[in-house]
Amino acid sequence: GILDTFIPKEWAEANGTTPDAVDGYLALQTLNKVFEYNCTGSKVYDNCWDFVAEDTHALFMDIDSEVVGKNFLYMLTEDKYAAMLKDAFNALPADEQAYFQPTIDEMESEANDLGLGADGKYALAWIKLWVGSYNAQTDDGPICNTLVSDSATDQCGLLVYSKLRSVEESAGVSVNNIKVAAYQDGYKGIGGYGYCHYLFVTDNSPLPWTACAFIAYMTCTEDGFSAWGKDMGGYSANPEVAAAIEETYQHSKGGYNEAGEDQFPCKDDRGYDWWTTD
C-alpha cells in the first residue's frame, strides 16, 4: 500500500509492548460520540432504546456523510454489543418492549442468515429502527447548537462529546440544557461509541524520518498531543500522555467554575477508561 505504519518505541513501551509486537495501526487518539438529550422538558432518556422509540428522531450525522457512523452500526452486531442491547431491552417496561418486539422478531431470520450470534436480532432491530428514524444532519456542530437551545425541548442526538467545549452561554443557550445520557444514574445500554484517529507515513514521503519524528512528537509528548488534548473528549492512545494531559487540563472537572462549584456537570469528562468499561 501507499501508507506505512511507524510505531514509536516510547509509545509502545508506554503501552507495555514493543514496536515489533504491535499488531495494527498507530492510534493518535480516541474520540467519542455520545447520546445527549435536551432536558428543558420532562422527557428522560434512560435506556438506549429510548433513542429509537416511537416518534423519536435523534439528530445524527448521516451515515453517508461520515463512515464512522456506519461503522458504529456494524459494530453493534458484535456479540458483546448485541448482548448489551438485549440486556437494555430486557430492562424496559413491558409496554415499551411491546413496541420493539415485532421488529426484533422480524430481524431473527436476518440475523441467522448473516451468521450473527444469539443476540444478533436485537442489534439488527436497533439498527433498523435507528436508520429509519434519525434526523439526518451534515455536521455535529449544528447538532450541538440545536440541543443546547432552550427551544429544543425533549430533542436528542448522537454527536461528538467535545462539541460541548465551544458552547457560549447566553439567555437561550446553555450546556445545562442537555444531559449526557450515560452519565445519568440508572442509564441502561450503550452510551455512544468511540473511534480512533490513526497516523501513517506515506511511501512517497520525501522526508520519512522527519515524518516519523513528528509522529513521535504527537504521540509521545504532552506538548505534541496538546493540540487535541487541551479539549475534552479526545483521549491519547499513550497512557502516559493521557495522564499528563489530565494533570494539566483537569478535564474530569471541566464543568467546575473558579469558585470550585460544579457548574456544568455534563462537561466533567469521565475519561477513556470510564467510557470503555462496562
Report each predicted region and the residues it spans.
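Short, intrinsically disordered, charge-balanced linker/junction segments flanking boundaries
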Residues: 1, 52, 270-278
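Extracytoplasmic ligand-binding site segments that recognize negatively charged/polar headgroups
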Residues: 1-142
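Sec-exported extracytoplasmic/periplasmic mature domains
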Residues: 2, 56-57, 77-81, 132, ...
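Residues that flank catalytic or metal-binding motifs in active/ligand-binding sites
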Residues: 29-31, 72, 194-197, 210
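Solvent-exposed loop/turn segments at secondary-structure junctions
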Residues: 33, 40-43, 64-69, 161-165, ...
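Short, hydrophobic alpha-helical packing/hinge segments within bilobed ligand-binding/sensory domains
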Residues: 48, 143-146, 211, 224
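Extracytoplasmic/periplasmic substrate-binding proteins
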Residues: 122-124, 132-204
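Mature extracytoplasmic/periplasmic domains
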Residues: 197-275
